Amino acid sequence: MADETKATDAGQRYAQSLFELTIENNQLTKVEADLKSLRAMVAASTDLRRLLESPAFSAEDKAKGLTAVAAKAGFQLLTAKFLGLVASNGRAGDLMGAITAFVEMSAQHRGVVTAEVVTASALTAAQLKGVSTAVASALGKTPEISTRVDPSILGGIKVRVGSRLFDASLRSKLDSLKFALKRA
């Protein structure tokens, strides 16, 4: 399965347009909060994920659904219009990537780097603080960290900052060992 949080070219363009509008209208933090909230809703709801991903729903149905979600959640008007536009243009599948791109643009605008941390089990507050400190010292910037649990990595940690991936997972170490043994 493709990584739906990776920004496509279309998602990047939508994110850039929204970013410019939020700067012009002085709504950057509010719209960013809305989009982060929507991202959490999509992660938590299989029905919402299905609405975005399934070709069985028309662009019009997706637009109506996203607009209803935005209204129910109390999103900014700009956010609601953006969601409706993306869906009605048949780009609902690019929405999560657009959100990721927007959040990265916003963080860059604030002078903060975004880092996605993937672990096999949830991190404690102390562990998260340690990761944050390590990322900050490595990059020289304050990190904004989002965490995700992926049991398939077996153990260790993966940290993605922009296009760079620091992979210290047990899965990758085992894969490397397997490859080395096959070559021997």
UniProtKB/Swiss-Prot annotation:
Gene3D superfamilies: N-terminal domain of the delta subunit of the F1F0-ATP synthase (1.10.520.20). Keywords: ATP synthesis, Cell inner membrane, Cell membrane, CF(1), Hydrogen ion transport, Ion transport, Membrane, Transport. Its main location: membrane. InterPro entries: ATP_synth_OSCP/delta_N_sf, ATPase_OSCP/dsu. GO terms for cellular component: plasma membrane; proton-transporting ATP synthase complex. It is a peripheral membrane protein. It is found in: Cell inner membrane. One of its GO terms (molecular function) is proton-transporting ATP synthase activity, rotational mechanism. F-type ATPases have 2 components, F(1) - the catalytic core - and F(0) - the membrane proton channel. F(1) has five subunits: alpha(3), beta(3), gamma(1), delta(1), epsilon(1). F(0) has three main subunits: a(1), b(2) and c(10-14). The alpha and beta chains form an alternating ring which encloses part of the gamma chain. F(1) is attached to F(0) by a central stalk formed by the gamma and epsilon chains, while a peripheral stalk is formed by the delta and b chains. Belongs to the ATPase delta chain family. PANTHER family: ATP SYNTHASE DELTA CHAIN. NCBIfam families: ATP_synt_delta, PRK05758.3-2. This is ATP synthase subunit delta. It comes from Caulobacter sp. (strain K31).
